[in-house]
């Protein structure tokens, strides 16, 4: 897992990370950028794929709605598409799905 140097310079990433910190604070275990932007092969109009790993995730769909509000605010401000999904913190270590494998392999901690 790499640490994103782009996190300090990309306003979409910094805005999203700040919003997650405000929403979730100590419940955040990690926030991970994955997909084309993490691999470095994104096009200018590529979306931002982000996994948000949360402690005490009781209602995934409630958190999806909260994160969607942040995604919309970022789109309104920057025109960038963010696709973020919440996951239970333990799924980082314990899930063997192809998507989780990709996130662990190519992901960039934000």
Which residues make up each language-model segment?
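Short beta-strand->loop micro-motif that forms the acidic, two-metal-ion catalytic signature
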Residues: 49-53
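Catalytic core of pol beta-like nucleotidyltransferases
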Residues: 1-30, 39-44, 55-110
